[in-house]
Amino acid sequence: MSNEAKCPFHHAAGNGTSNRDWWPDQLDLSALHRHSSLSDPMDRDFNYAQAFEKLDLAAVKRDLHALMTTSQDWWPADFGHYGGLFIRMAWHSAGTYRTADGRGGAGEGQQRFAPLNSWPDNANLDKARRLLWPIKQKYGRSISWADLLILTGNVALESMGFKTFGFAGGRADTWEPEDVYWGSEKIWLELSGGPNSRYSGDRQLENPLAAVQMGLIYVNPEGPDGNPDPVAAARDIRDTFARMAMNDEETVALIAGGHTFGKTHGAGPASNVGPEPEAAGLEEQGLGWKSAYGTGKGADAITSGLEVTWTKTPTQWSNNFFENLFGYEWELTKSPAGAHQWVAKDADAVIPDAFDPSKKHRPTMLTTDLSLRFDPAYEKISRRFHEHPDEFADAFARAWFKLTHRDMGPRARYLGPEVPAEELLWQDPIPAVDHPLIDAADVAALKAQVLASGLSVSQLVSTAWAAASTFRGSDKRGGANGARIRLAPQKDWEANQPEQLATVLATLEAIRRTFNGAQSGGKRVSLADLIVLAGCAGVEQAAKNAGHAVTVPFAPGRMDASQEQTDVESMAVLEPLADGFRNYLKGKYRVPAEVLLVDKAQLLTLSAPEMTVLLGGLRVLGANAGQSRHGVFTARAQALTNDFFVNLLDMSTEWKPASADADVFEGRDRATGALKWTGTRVDLVFGSHSQLRALAEVYASADAQEKFVRDFVAVWNKVMNLDRFDLA
């Protein structure tokens, strides 16, 4: 018998063929089970916000300032300063953010984990994080990796003479990779046009992606698919940066500002570079890209394969990027690694060498740098920045702050002494509470008025759901606070049933106005609070209709934002294209509806049991978009019963597709053939999928009605308060 056959761990957990191998199209619920307490090493009562507030941030920054110019032999600093490396580290931590679903970004320190830690575009950032380890070790739990990566980028800028806009802490670390769709390609940096291409038609990038190739943060610096065409590259830049919420001015400022510092690395052919961290040997201890070219570091370093230093001041803030961009004509050349780049024609050697003070080089640029000169819109902005350095500095400071804080959500989450006082439109500002809040007696009185207003349980519940369910746990945007459901663009979204919504809001506004007018001492109720309170009243009434007396928790303190405080274009990305909880699809999609339901549930930070009980409850409460009857498996309308589950699992019903695409199904009596119900893929998956059926069976059982109501109320309350960071 071979030694391998004798191995006692040959059949260890995790080995062998997986369910995913057998059934690759099986609905995957794993995204709903990540980041549980089982993967978190911190004590259950650990509160990162409290720990950060006690941190001596000035001391951390002093240590970071010292680190910038303390070059280590195992990874020497370019020009004697790590600033450029750390700016790239922070940029690439934040730069994965995308507006379509709010995923990516710096908020959880995901750069530490696969796949991001091994993306080609993040090559050698493992060294940057390892340089930071002594500081992280020193301050421990008081500063997360997520905050430290961004703070280090800020300090890098400040140490090189740049005045930043500010810094906010509050990014708590997670301890495992996020389940994010980064594309379908099976090869790093696969070019467009392949079988798994993210592009279609006239170079239309697949949603929700925001990078041009697998393993890149934004664009290919050599140009589209390596084609060194600055004008074509500008199209890619504009598309990808817009998908990260950056306009043309912010884009120019970020590229030019970031490329004022440091250099790229392409001393030799990429064939000299070893595997990325996740593929490297144990002895590398989490480091990757070990190079056999020369010393493998310093002047011999290979990262992107490009060998470019943009300015003669690579460790000092200046306007030299634009001076060089417009001061020379440029000719195409190749780096020592064979990558396309550009060199200034007939130029003197004025650019310092990163390691040899006796050497100088001609100015060099990337294809994507030249886009700032040869794209007409970018050129206009670039020339203004060239002529007005103060405007450039301010634009870069603001764009850098936006880049590094875009996924943090509202200002209520910002921590620390360097939070800027200025309120910015992209932060989705909401006025601070400036009046006494309603008390328990007021809550009871308002509920009674709402229930006597003529609005149905369905109208109350669906309106509150429409307001609250815009929340995204990814970038902490959306939610009921602000009452933006009454403003453009939310009031006009198809999923929100604009005509019904207008009726409900008008009724609630009349109740609010009457209540506020009768108060003394300045007490008021906001429409945002009243929308949620009305939904809670609807749930209580539905439970009563089912024979259960419950009190749905309610915490006042929401305020109403104005239209002027709402960026319509920015808010538009929150529009639900699919909301399985309302049985809503705006269009026909390649991705099955049940997959989109799980995606929505994950953005709402729901577990599989929470998703299950919530959907079953919303169906019987009549919360479907357009008053659709699909999935309303009950004869007791607007009563909070477990009928959805009971009737879905009833074996006297036979289900068959009602259309060729199997998006809608008919449930008929097995004996008579009479039509009993209709349902969508989202409805039937709770009887088809083995895990979801197991959950549905819990709520369909004879003893489950009370538990069902209790669990529904709990998850309803959770969703209504997802954006209430003031309650944390």
UniProtKB/Swiss-Prot annotation:
It comes from Burkholderia thailandensis (strain ATCC 700388 / DSM 13276 / CCUG 48851 / CIP 106301 / E264). Gene3D superfamilies: 1.10.520.10, Peroxidase, domain 2 (1.10.420.10). Keywords: Heme, Hydrogen peroxide, Iron, Metal-binding, Oxidoreductase, Peroxidase. Coiled coil: none annotated. This is Catalase-peroxidase. One of its GO terms (biological process) is cellular response to hydrogen peroxide. One of its GO terms (molecular function) is catalase activity. Its cofactor is heme b. InterPro entries: Catalase_peroxidase, Haem_peroxidase, Haem_peroxidase_sf, Peroxidases_AS, Peroxidases_heam-ligand_BS. Transmembrane segments: none annotated. There is a cross-link at Y218-M244 (Tryptophyl-tyrosyl-methioninium (Tyr-Met) (with W-91)). Its EC number is 1.11.1.21.
